Amino acid sequence: YYSRYGGFWRFPEMLDYCYLVNPYFNRSSIIADMQEFFPVLVSEYPSGMGVNSLLASKCWNIKQEYVIPGNGAAELIKVLMEDLVGTIGVIRPTFEEYPNRLPDERVFTFVSKKADFRYDEDDLIEYFSTVPVDTLLLINPDNPSGNFISMQGIRKLADWTKQKNIQFILDESFVDFTYG
């Protein structure tokens, strides 16, 4: 499976996680549907985002306003950050696509004082209790440090942000590569 992806064909023992792929994807019906509707998909692309969010909301039985359809992570991050108001707390080092979308005066940064940049939910709660923000953004596991907060820690952080009326944004793009 892994030999089909990445650019490390000279190093077959190396696994390349640069591309987000799903080896368990059920291809049986979706490929057939795409083939059947290919002429429509090509001639009528792109569908209105309203149509896409409505279809997704019906599929997952959630409110339509909870769905933001997009063409990849970069577009979704851009839309998300443009809609945020107030200040945002980030943890650095981090994936800079998020904070780079805002002026510096709106971004408040936590940097772990530990040599390996490790931190946990208690470190974040302690810091952001003294540096109030409107939104807390957590990438978990973090890119590039690889720091990971367990599900129990995430729940504690989510409860704390709810209690403090802080919007909590959790990006778990690479959570499939973690344990716990």
Mark where each language-model region is.
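N-terminal "arm"/small-domain region of PLP-dependent enzymes with the aminotransferase-like
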Residues: 1-44, 131-132
